[in-house]
C-alpha cells in the first residue's frame, strides 16, 4: 500500500484573506510555503490603497509572481518603470516601489515569494 502526501487547496477557500481598498489577497499555506493570489480592481494603486493604511509610501516587499489577467505598472524608486501583463512571470527586488492597475480590467496575479509579508498590518 502506498502512502500519499498530496495536498490540494483552492484560492476560493484561502487559509487567510487580507482585504484593502480596491483589492483582496488570498493566501494558501502549502508544502512549507505561502502562495498568494491578489486581485486589484481598476484604479487600484499600492501607495493609496495599501500603503496609506500601513503608513508606507512604497512597497518594501520582494516579489516573484505570475500575472493571471490584467496589466499593472511597477515603478521603482530608482526611476525604472515596467508594465507587467497577463502571462508575465516577474521578479521585483526588495527595493522601494509603487504599483498600479492599468486599464479597465482587474489585475490578478499569483505571488510565490513575498506573500507572507505582503499587506500585513
Question: Residues of each region from the PLM?
Answer:
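A short, N-terminal "cap"/entry segment at the start of jelly-roll beta-barrel domains
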Residues: 1-39, 47
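Conserved short histidine dyad/triad with adjacent acidic residue
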Residues: 37-59, 93-94
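A short hydrophobic beta-strand segment most commonly corresponding to one strand
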Residues: 37-38, 91-92, 97-98, 103-121
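Glycine- and acidic-residue-biased ligand/ion/polar-headgroup-sensing regions
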Residues: 33, 52-78
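Short acidic-glycine-tyrosine-enriched beta hairpin
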Residues: 76-95
Amino acid at each position: 500500500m502506498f502512502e500519499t502526501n498530496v495536498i490540494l487547496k483552492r484560492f476560493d477557500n484561502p487559509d487567510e484573506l487580507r482585504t484593502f481598498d480596491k483589492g483582496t489577497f488570498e493566501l494558501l499555506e502549502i508544502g512549507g510555503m505561502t502562495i498568494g493570489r491578489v486581485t486589484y480592481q481598476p484604479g487600484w494603486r499600492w501607495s493609496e490603497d495599501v500603503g496609506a493604511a500601513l503608513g508606507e509610501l512604497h512597497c518594501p516587499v520582494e516579489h516573484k509572481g505570475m500575472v493571471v489577467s490584467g496589466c499593472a505598472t511597477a515603478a521603482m524608486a530608482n526611476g525604472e518603470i515596467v508594465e507587467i501583463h497577463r502571462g508575465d512571470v516577474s521578479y521585483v527586488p526588495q527595493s522601494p516601489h509603487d504599483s498600479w492597475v492599468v486599464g479597465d480590467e482587474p489585475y490578478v496575479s499569483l505571488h510565490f515569494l513575498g506573500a507572507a509579508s505582503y499587506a500585513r498590518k
